[in-house]
Amino acid sequence: MSVIERRGSIRSEAVFSDDYTHRFILRKEWNKEKKKAVVIMIQPNTSDPYELDLTTVRVINNLNRLDYGYVDLVNTYSLITKKLNLRINEDDLVREENDGYIIRACTKTDAVILAWGSIEETSPKVAKRLEELMIKLEPFKDKMYIICDSYSRVARHPLAPSVSSYWNLVKVY
């Protein structure tokens, strides 16, 4: 039996506001020959492009299993926070340039994955923000997916236990 050595690396890049309170995009690339995805979630929880939180790990692992090699992680709200406080003024939660980063990322990708789960069902403020964003994302509806488990067509967040190790990507339209 012979031994095989494999090497790999993940290139990280992030764009922040000048005061590091908002993150607009986090890019991760591990194989530039493979497909690209944009994953849209609710808010970033770290300002360190090298820190891998559980959500980012699950996104990378599941996309890699689905033969992707690149992801742009973007969020509906750009404020970096461990827990989203919806009592904060909308202008403090999301900077004006955030949607521009989302739209530019969507123009250069193979798949746009809506990964916010079902939060809009419990929060009217988030539902309104997502509705505004979805209007802007209309040109990309042909490559728009939600994360589902193997048993349902219910939208899931990457941290949902039922999709922790396998994503079933279902077309939105």
Residue ranges and their predicted role:
Residues 24, 53-60, 91-100:
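Short acidic (Asp/Glu) patches
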Residues 1-53:
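Active-site and ligand/interface coordination hotspots across diverse enzymes
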Residues 69-85:
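Short connector loops at secondary-structure junctions
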Residues 36, 69-70, 111, 143:
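Residues at the starts of beta-strands that form the adenosine-phosphate
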Residues 45-67:
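A short mixed-secondary-structure module that forms the rim of ligand-binding clefts
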Residues 87-173:
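Glycine/proline-rich loop-helix segments at beta-alpha junctions forming the active-site rim
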Residues 46, 80, 120:
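Feature marks short, surface-exposed loop/turn motifs that line or immediately flank catalytic pockets
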